[in-house]
Curated annotation (Swiss-Prot):
GO molecular function annotation: alkanesulfonate monooxygenase activity
Lineage: Bacteria, Pseudomonadati, Pseudomonadota, Gammaproteobacteria, Pseudomonadales
Keywords, in A-Z order: Flavoprotein, FMN, Monooxygenase, Oxidoreductase
Catalytic activity: an alkanesulfonate + FMNH2 + O2 = an aldehyde + FMN + sulfite + H2O + 2 H(+)
Protein name as it appears in the record: Alkanesulfonate monooxygenase
Record-linked InterPro entries: Alkanesulphonate_mOase_FMN-dep (IPR019911), Luciferase-like_dom (IPR011251), Luciferase-like_sf (IPR036661), SsuD_RutA_monooxygenase (IPR050172)
Organism of origin: Pseudomonas savastanoi pv. phaseolicola (strain 1448A / Race 6)
Length: 379
């Protein structure tokens, strides 16, 4: 099992949909989140992409030398950048990070943003471009001089003279809910990602991708993207969930849902259908809450509960075949600690160990000394 955290390069705070309790997302703050994730033993961090975020490649490049073990899941955007240039960027960052780069393949689900970035392709064309892009990208990073002529992309003698550390190339992660997305995942990527739908729906998606991959003689790993609200008691967790959205007005929800309706993303449509823009019935499965999706695009669901409940839901998804879990919580610095402290001990190794991923406690016992003389009691 690999557990990721999230870098909030699009903003952070105590509440959604308001400036109340918000905090500036500076390089120093992102460094704190990344270093906390590194020290706590998270496998990696996802860096979001798009016009609402700081650039993911610049952020990753700034944070790589400030962390030791943490991997960075960074987006590439077929149709927006050349596959050859993207491959060379990936090779460089993989080398400079000591092999800590992971690649998130993003086709882009907002036509308005895509047009602003110079891409006027429809949904099916974007997947055609992504397929051609990855065929070039993968071969370039394996050391080939690539000649390729497809429907959308053409290169001659495309090459990267400096290879990546990871072989054959940094692992490819990819998410999408349409048939075209499932075909692409089955054919080209290493890890298929889904947003946090109820377990039965996730099981259907995984089975479909697994079957398509088997027909091509391939196997694909699976991951899930979820928020998490965990507290020592279930009552506290559900109160925290309500508090997170207490400052969102109905007008803000309506405006957000109107914006999402222009997307041609099947995954975004499925997220919106979980709540229909209403806040009166947000627990859509045991301990699975759709409140985040009222105003946030992309991943819109959270696991909510006490540590045992959250761990049980994680195991439920793991039993479906999920082995990468990408979590986040508001605010991201505090919640990175809270999740690690409350839930890691209930997860499989290496997370079940207080030492995390081999991190040793060099300063003495955990907790503050008692009366300047006694170590804190172990529990």
């Amino acid at each position: 099992m690999n557990v990721f955290w999230f870098l909030p390069t699009h903003g952070d705070g105590h509440y959604l949909g308001t400036t109340k309790g918000a905090r500036p997302v500076t390089l120093n703050y992102l460094k704190q989140v990344a270093q906390a994730a590194d020290d706590l033993g998270y496998y990696g961090v996802l860096i979001p992409t798009g016009r609402s975020c700081e650039d993911s490649w610049v952020i990753a490049s700034a944070l790589v030398p400030l962390t030791e073990r943490l991997k960075y899941l960074v987006a590439i955007r077929p149709g927006i950048i050349s596959p050859t240039v993207s491959a060379r960027m990936a090779a460089t960052l993989d080398r400079l990070s000591g092999g800590r780069l992971l690649i998130n393949v993003v086709t882009g689900g907002d036509p308005d943003e895509n047009r602003g970035d110079g891409s006027f392709l429809d949904h099916s064309e974007r997947y055609e471009v992504t397929d051609e892009f990855l065929k070039i990208w993968r071969r370039v990073l394996q050391g080939e001089a690539v000649d390729f002529e497809g429907k959308h992309l053409r290169v001659q003698n495309a090459k990267a003279l400096y290879p990546p550390i990871q072989k054959p190339y940094p692992p490819l992660y990819f998410g999408g809910s349409s048939d075209a997305a499932h075909d692409l995942a089955a054919d080209q990527v290493d890890v298929y990602l889904t947003w946090g739908e109820p377990p039965a729906a996730v099981a259907q998606k995984l089975a479909d991708v697994r079957e398509r991959a088997a027909r091509k003689g391939r196997t694909v790993k699976f991951g899930i993207r979820l928020h998490v609200i965990v507290r020592e008691t279930s009552e506290e967790a559900w109160k925290a969930a309500s508090t997170l959205i207490e400052h969102i007005s109905d007008e803000t929800i309506a405006a957000a849902q109107k914006s999402f309706s222009r997307f041609d993303s099947e995954g975004q449509r499925r997220m919106a259908a979980l709540h229909d823009g209403r806040r009166d019935n947000l627990e859509i499965a045991p301990n699975l809450w759709a409140g985040v999706g009222l105003v946030r695009g992309g991943a819109g669901t959270a696991l909510v509960g006490n540590p045992q409940e959250v761990a049980a839901r994680i195991k439920e998804y793991a039993d479906l075949g999920i082995d990468s879990f990408i979590f986040s919580g508001y605010p991201h610095l505090e919640e990175a600690y809270r999740f690690a402290e409350l839930v890691f001990p209930l997860l499989p190794e290496p997370y079940a160990s207080l030492a995390g991923r081999g991190i040793t406690n060099l300063t003495g016992p955990f907790g503050e000394m008692i009366a300047n003389d006694l170590p804190p009691q172990a529990k």
